[in-house]
Amino acid sequence: VSIHKIRSGETLIVEGPARIVVDEGELTLIGAPIRQGDTIIVKKSRHVAVEGTTDSALKISLGASGHVDLLNTSTIPLEWKELAETLNKLTIPFRAVFFGDIDTGKTTFVTYLANIFYQWGKRTGVVSTDLGQGFPGLITLYQLETPIVDMAEITPTDAFFVGSTTPDCFENRVMIGTELMIKKAESVGIEALFVDTTGWVYGFKARELKKSLIELIQPDVLVVVERERELEHLIRPFLNSTKVLRMPVSPKIRYRNRTDRKFLRESMLSKQLSGSDTITFHFKEVSFFNSFLNTGEIVSGTLNEKISEIVEYVPKYVEVCSDVILIAEDHETPLSENIIEKFQEEFPHLPIQIISAEIIENVLVGLIDIQNTFLGYGVITNIDFLKQLITIYTPVSKEQISSIQFGSLKVTPDGRELCWIHPWSF
């Protein structure tokens, strides 16, 4: 443990892992006040910037890769502070949307503003649509009840499961989740709502998503955090219809590489899955979403014999939906072109899809109750097609669960990422 003294106006940047205890004085952390006796835990691959309000002293314990830097200025740009004053002049309730590339400090900026408005007595909320940060694969709503030091360390007020750490291929789910979280914010009387968006900003699909989000949210102000007008392609179409405010990136922003980002996602999933147990459902006990499976009729009798004759073996599980025929095995079994042609002749309007237990096992899922509320994460550990049983590793109690929403990320039960699979792979 070492003692670090900091004067009013100076900033101490602490890279984790580290433990900080305020020994004396008053400070701020992203706009949140911290005082004598307060403790801050900084995890590996994260950092905090503690700014002295008065002359202060901190007791800091550093881990193996932790370190401390002292700056004689604030890491919060003056323009950010001025924006808070500008937004405070808006009629409440208001919505502010934030655009920015990765590593521009959007989330830090949003957290700072949320803390300031909370301390100004406003009912304050944050909607995070950044699927790769915080809670992986979720769109989250936070209603502030105290100032926030790190949104990843508090429980969301509500959440929507997308099931991917990127919005690419999941734009519709992002839109739906964002709309639901905004409606929830309205229902609880949020006066100042800040919407943090993903750093996906290049390419026509990113353009389309950002355009759709603006049209959906209809913000009172669009805040663009950029270095050198690199987001001009996104905002120029809105200059005549939306109030756009350009903000600089903090010069002290720290870059995170892919390894750091992956580590933080895995750490979050590991934390969320801790204390889990396995639960098993019969297919008939629960609804499946984002999957063809369990949405049709299980084949038996003459039709089953016909399908077995075409594929030249007896499948473990065959399900016919209005738009697809599913054949399930324990292991992936590709069909020959000859067999596919026979299927097309026999069922000209129904494509065939081969699915396997291998594809489904280790898929990250969202568990939902009867009111369509997200309850928590789960990981598929086993699926038995013959018995129509699915087993999930989760901290959520079985009695609460009404439906399973399948994601496109495969992870181990302790949260380590394995691979990404295409949506509707099974």
Residue map of PLM features:
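Phosphate/Mg2+-binding loops and adjacent switch elements
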Residues: 184, 188-245
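The conserved Walker
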Residues: 102
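Nucleotide-state-sensitive switch-loop elements of NTP-binding domains
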Residues: 75-93, 97-99, 121-195, 200-201
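Conserved mixed alpha/beta catalytic, RNA-binding, or beta-rich assembly cores of soluble enzyme
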Residues: 138-142, 199, 210, 341, ...
